[in-house]
Amino acid sequence: MASQKHSRGHGSKQMATASTYDHSRHGYGAHGRHRDSGLLDSLGRFFGGERSVPRKGSGKEVHMSRSGYLSSSPQRSPYHAHGRHVDDNPVVHFFRNIVSPRTPPPSQPKRGFSRFSWGAENHKPYYGGYGSRSLEHHKSSYKGYKDPHREGHGSLSRIFKLGGQRSRSSSPMARR
């Protein structure tokens, strides 16, 4: 009993910290982190509980958390969610929020891919499989925000720098 609780708590901590890292890396800052902390915690509990609880036969806890989660965020989850997709949809929603501000075109293939890979690699290979790729993605933007030597590497800072300098020197009016 104690080990079951321990593993569930550990799993939710891992998920929550990973998710919070993703948010802070994208520069949402304290405002975004505060607002999403409830969502991240529920996501962490979601996956942490999803892994170990149903095996023991106490699925009532999971259903209660599911219904609570669905009612708290009435986006598209209630539409698609009829059992199996419930645990996929928060992930899809989460990745959509992370991926779309930076790179809108690849968000669609990644959305479908993240669904399958996260479902398949939910146990431990998650770090080696999809996690490594997403971390590489985040590292590049993270360096742009934090590292003063590589300020031009983050996509947002690159846009602002290029747009800020070039739009003043060679504006569309000057070209014509």
From Swiss-Prot:
Belongs to the myelin basic protein family. The lineage of its organism: Eukaryota, Metazoa, Chordata, Craniata, Vertebrata. The modification Citrulline is found at residues 25, 33, 176. This is Myelin basic protein. Residues 1-176 are annotated as: Disordered. It comes from Xenopus laevis (African clawed frog). The modification Symmetric dimethylarginine is found at residue 111. It holds the Pfam family Myelin_MBP. The modification Phosphothreonine is found at residue 103. Residues 1-11 have a biased composition (Basic residues).
